[in-house]
Regions:
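N-terminal assembly/interaction segments in proteins that build large macromolecular machines
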Residues: 3-180
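A short, hydrophobic C-terminal helix/tail in secreted or cell-surface proteins
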Residues: 181-185
């Protein structure tokens, strides 16, 4: 009986993850449409900070892991990609690590890797309020030039069996991503 409940719980978590995917892509499409119809944009969120030497830039890495449960490749591949990106960012400047999920916090903590900010139990029970807290933290540091670019590293659910780690640049916003023919309806 316990195994059945556990499998059902994992199935429900997987189903919930799959249900968020259309929202993510719809949001990207909406941003594309808005940016495409704007005149030349001069906004702090589009600032590439080209005047700042590469060695002085700080990269923010938001690493999304599970709080509990779904283990294995779901977390392992994201953590591996995060470590690769930390090494890469460390070679050309510095990085700040922001961790969503208890397993990521434990992973980096056991390795003595400094985490700038950790967001507990956000992966297990995401809410708009928790998303706003993360957003405000990141935007504040970007606006104050404590961060020069921000990436999110997460697990993409290809299907119910296959997952793959993904990395997406959040800041500065790359206007060309949203104005190219690829972004057309």
């Amino acid at each position: 009986m316990y195994k059945r409940q556990r499998k059902d719980g994992a199935f429900i978590k997987l189903k919930n993850l799959e249900e968020t995917e259309p929202y993510f892509y719809t949001l990207q499409t909406m941003v594309s449409r808005i940016v495409r119809h704007l005149p030349e944009i001069d906004n702090k969120y589009f600032d590439e900070r080209k005047d700042k030497p590469a060695g002085e830039k700080t990269t923010g890495l938001i690493v999304v892991t599970a709080d509990k449960g779904l283990a294995g490749a779901y977390n392992h591949n994201v953590l591996k990609m995060a470590e690769e990106q930390m090494q890469k960012a460390g070679q050309t400047g510095s990085y700040k690590l922001f961790v969503v999920g208890e397993l990521g916090r434990q992973y980096f903590g056991h390795r003595g890797i400094k985490v700038a900010e950790q967001f507990h139990y956000t992966a297990q029970n995401p809410t708009l309020h928790r998303a706003r807290i993360i957003t405000e933290t990141i935007l504040e540091q970007f606006e104050e030039e404590q961060l020069d670019e921000v990436y999110i590293i997460y697990t993409n659910m290809v299907n119910s069996v296959t997952t793959e780690p993904q990395m997406l640049r959040l800041l500065p916003i790359v206007c060309l991503l949203y104005t190219s023919d690829a972004a057309d309806d």
